[in-house]
């Protein structure tokens, strides 16, 4: 038996097919992964993401600590609640984890990290924190739901009080706010508008049930994966890991090399990698029959690469993928499938946003 979120029984009751996900018993789907995918693109779906790890960082050196620990620069965050996508790197510039950090004040931040890397992340955070005047606290007293889709604002309005909804009405993307016992952020992993809602664990099931009563579709890990891949969002362990730098994972935009005098873990290795040149993560589109899959070989101008994530796209009706390839890549490539070379188009990662193709 794996670890269970506070919603385990609710998932079983809702007919979920449960699977092991990095030691957690999590719902893969509730009957139809494709229907759940379409619900998020066209209406609204809710995911239990309580397996994610929330870490609060406080202390007089909180900002200095995070400026050293993380590749992006938290000093850029000036507005209370503002979120930033970033990563923790090792000395070789490899990605220990990608995460979101929220700014409350220069002495208080919140990080949300992946469940698959939880133990390693927490050990790394504590090790680095030992040299700073900070405290780090895992918030395992909280659960988290992701409410995603074009109708997310309507649905959340129906389960909050008028006063609570007024607090978040019109909130810009990538911002979080304390609303009573909840922490509500305009973030997500689907390419749709929506919210991630951090809730005291004992209140989680009531909120889940209220959302299901409001005709929000419960969604599992299967739809979460096809949605994030359509949106061109990385999955840790597939699209990058501790042996891959952000520069090779289409995450260069989340590394702050300026100001030049800020030292952060992995900086020197990244600067060297930048100077030497490196592979890049691209999107692939195949409108022929067949499905692009993780691990397939990609042939491009000047070399070979590999598909890191691939799937049939329910929104587009054909197969899409992300692949790490030599930087010499042109507009087309070939993927080896069943001993045949299939032609594919090379595009920027990201295929669907707000329900529409961006190809």
From Swiss-Prot:
GO cellular component: cytosol; glycine cleavage complex
Coiled coil: none
Gene3D superfamilies to which the protein is assigned, alphabetical: Aminomethyltransferase beta-barrel domains, Aminomethyltransferase fragment, Probable tRNA modification gtpase trme, domain 1
Keyword set includes NADP: no
A biological-process GO annotation: glycine decarboxylation via glycine cleavage system
Keywords: Aminotransferase, Transferase
Domain of life of the organism encoding this protein: Bacteria
EC main group: transferase
Catalytic function, reaction form: N(6)-[(R)-S(8)-aminomethyldihydrolipoyl]-L-lysyl-[protein] + (6S)-5,6,7,8-tetrahydrofolate = N(6)-[(R)-dihydrolipoyl]-L-lysyl-[protein] + (6R)-5,10-methylene-5,6,7,8-tetrahydrofolate + NH4(+)
Entry's Gene Ontology molecular function annotations: aminomethyltransferase activity; transaminase activity
Enzyme nomenclature, EC number: 2.1.2.10
Biological role: The glycine cleavage system catalyzes the degradation of glycine.
Subunit structure comment from the entry: The glycine cleavage system is composed of four proteins: P, T, L and H.
Family: Belongs to the GcvT family.
Stated name of the protein: Aminomethyltransferase
Taxonomic placement: Bacteria, Pseudomonadati, Pseudomonadota, Gammaproteobacteria, Alteromonadales
């Amino acid at each position: 038996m794996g670890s269970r979120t506070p919603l385990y029984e609710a998932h079983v009751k809702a007919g979920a097919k449960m699977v092991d996900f990095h030691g957690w018993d999590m719902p893969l789907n509730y009957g139809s992964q494709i229907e759940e995918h379409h619900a998020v693109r066209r209406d609204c779906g809710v995911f239990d993401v309580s397996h994610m790890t929330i870490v609060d960082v406080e202390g007089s050196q909180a900002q200095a600590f995070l400026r050293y620990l993380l590749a992006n620069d938290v000093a850029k965050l000036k507005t209370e609640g503002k979120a930033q996508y970033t990563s923790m790197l090792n000395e070789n510039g490899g990605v220990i984890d990608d995460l979101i950090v929220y700014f409350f004040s220069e002495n208080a931040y919140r990080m949300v990290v992946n469940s698959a890397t939880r133990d390693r992340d927490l050990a790394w955070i504590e090790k680095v924190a030992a040299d700073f005047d900070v405290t780090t606290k895992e918030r395992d007293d909280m659960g988290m739901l992701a409410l995603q889709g074009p109708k997310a604002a309507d649905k959340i309005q129906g389960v909050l009080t008028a006063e609570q909804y007024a607090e978040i009405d019109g909130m810009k993307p990538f911002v979080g706010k304390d609303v009573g016992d909840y922490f509500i952020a305009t973030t997500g992993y689907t390419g749709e508008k929506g919210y991630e809602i951090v809730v005291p664990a004992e209140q989680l099931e009531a909120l889940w049930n209220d959302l299901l009563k409001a005709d929000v579709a419960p969604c599992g890990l299967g739809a979460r994966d096809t949605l994030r891949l359509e949106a061109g969002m990385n999955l840790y362990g597939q699209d990058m890991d501790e042996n891959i730098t952000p520069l090779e994972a289409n995450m260069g935009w989340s590394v702050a090399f300026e100001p030049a005098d800020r030292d952060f873990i992995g900086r020197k290795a990244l600067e060297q990698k930048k100077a030497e040149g490196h592979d890049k993560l691209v999107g692939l589109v195949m409108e022929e029959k067949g499905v692009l899959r993780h691990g397939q070989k990609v042939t491009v101008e000047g070399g070979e690469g590999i598909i890191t994530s691939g799937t049939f796209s329910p929104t587009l009706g054909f197969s899409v993928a992300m692949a790490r390839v030599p930087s010499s890549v042109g507009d087309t490539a070939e993927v080896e499938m069943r001993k045949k070379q299939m032609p594919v188009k090379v595009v920027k990662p990201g295929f669907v946003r707000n329900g529409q193709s961006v190809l």
